[in-house]
Amino acid sequence: MKGLVIKTTGSSYIVRMNDGSDAECHVKGNFRIRGIRSTNPVAVGDFVTVEDGWIMDVEDRRNYIIRKSTNLSKESHILAANIDQVALIVTVNHPVTSTTFIDRFLATCEAYRVRAILIFNKIDLLTDEELAQLADLRALYESIGYETLALSALDLNSATSNSEASNAEGSNARSAINSLFAGKVTLLSGNSGVGKSTLLNALFGRELTRTGKISDAHDKGMHTTTFSEMYFLEEKNERTKDEGNLSPFTFHPSALIDTPGIKGFGTIDFEREEVSHFFPEIFRASQECRFSNCTHTNEPGCAVQQKIITGDIAISRYESYLSILDDTTEGKYRA
């Protein structure tokens, strides 16, 4: 029988079967997916075949988002599979989300051809100086082509603006975010403490996941979500007896996948010559470089270096590019 993995708990998986029922399933110790080495051979969003409570097969994935499990680790971890977009939740402060983390995540989305949206949360806590920093960050990423949204998950009814959704009079954060998520499977990710769980609870109007406080000592987030889980936003149709073998998405066209907060983001299997392809503005500039194999580090006639001097490419983005380039030679990453 076929179904959709909607929750992982480490040792087991909850599968929404095509008849609408949920089943707790397991995988055998030697279960692996060909060509992918990861700590979790099955991920939320996978379509699977189940027999007697065992996951026997995983259908070919349309896409997935993967990262290195921990610093200096050779293991990888799949955050989610078969998604339409990623909503990366970031904060200018409380805690600070580094541009290195943002850029590494965005580069991975580019590599796996997954649309990425930046949602800046906790804007109600920002000082005037931090609000100016927020405006600069939004301008930077929107100039590259990424959609951004700024809000407070504690007050989704407050006025807001985003780069593509309607900014008509009366528009608020709730309507803007509902527009972004409608009809799509969206992965929510970000550092610990940025408010993913708070946002999820606010969208559903009830406590789906526990929220936590920020550590006073280091202003770092503390994990509250411990496992990945998919939540369906709305019902489209009522299931009838004759529709017992249809995908859950037939009845729930919009879904959010909540994932545990992560500290750093290590890229997987990036070839050195491909890294620039995952930074759109660097890739565009590279077409004017003197050498086709330019790494944009110290070669003469490098158009990327010239764009940095003129301010057309942000130094923070270039530094993130260099850090990933370093991954390809040393096999490590820094958050």
Question: Where are the predicted features?
Answer:
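Glycine- and charge-enriched low-complexity intrinsically disordered segments
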Residues: 3, 79-101
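Helix-rich effector regions associated with P-loop NTPase G domains
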Residues: 11, 37-53, 58-85, 115-116, ...
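Beta-strand/loop nucleic-acid-binding surfaces
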Residues: 22-40
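Histidine-anchored nucleotide/phosphate-binding helix
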Residues: 100-115
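Canonical P-loop GTPase G-domain recognition
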Residues: 125-194
